[in-house]
Design a protein with these regions (language model features):
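C-terminal portion of ABC ATPase nucleotide-binding domains
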Residues: 37, 46, 50, 102, ...
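ABC ATPase nucleotide-binding domain helical subdomain, centered on the C-loop/LSGGQ "ABC signature"
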Residues: 16-57, 101, 110
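Hydrophobic anchor residue at the start of the ABC signature
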Residues: 72, 116
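ABC-fold ATPase nucleotide-binding domain signature/coupling loops
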Residues: 41-70, 85-88, 92-95, 162-167
Length: 167
């Protein structure tokens, strides 16, 4: 099992060293593949030293979204049967979040993913969605059924898609 939290930790050392906290025996190619799945490879390749780029303690020299994607890649290197993502894409834009979700569906379909998110777009393709209201389960179903039956889910969906439909 691997867990990626919203507030994640990077250590002082290279990107490659940080990734290998997930699997100390991971090859460069495995690290690159995990980064591709987490939509991190592209920005890592833009650094002058690529995977040998030094990360400051706490990851202060990368953005919040970059930090989250590196931590997702690190978790993927564990090759977990269960992957828990606790609001772990909150600092990335919705397009990147969608790309990460799509790569999970296509490349790691047999991994059980538990996704905790405030973004409906992050969970809408899940087999089942749990809607919580003040810590109490208010709904449990598919995206389509919750849109028809759950007022809280409907309101959140409407709020999050309103700007997209007007654009």
């Amino acid at each position: 099992m691997a867990v990626v939290l919203q507030n994640n930790v990077l250590f002082s050392g290279t990107i490659l060293q940080n990734l290998r906290w997930g699997n100390e025996n991971a090859t460069l190619e495995e690290c690159q593949e995990a980064c591709r799945l987490a939509c991190a490879d592209e920005f890592v390749q833009r650094f002058e030293d690529s995977y040998n780029t030094y990360i400051e303690q706490g990851g202060t020299n990368v953005s919040g979204g970059q930090k989250q994607r590196l931590c997702i890649a690190r978790a993927l290197l564990k090759k977990p049967k269960i992957l828990i993502l606790d609001d772990s894409t909150s600092a990335v834009d919705t397009a990147t979040d969608a790309s990460i979700q799509q790569s999970f569906e296509e490349r790691i379909p047999d991994t059980t993913k538990i996704i905790i998110s405030q973004r409906i777009s992050s969970v809408q393709n899940a087999d089942r969605i749990i809607v919580l209201n003040d810590g109490v389960v208010d709904g449990f179903d598919t995206h389509e059924k919750l849109l028809k039956t759950n007022a809280i889910y409907q309101t959140i969906h409407e709020t999050q898609t309103k700007g997209k439909e007007e654009a």
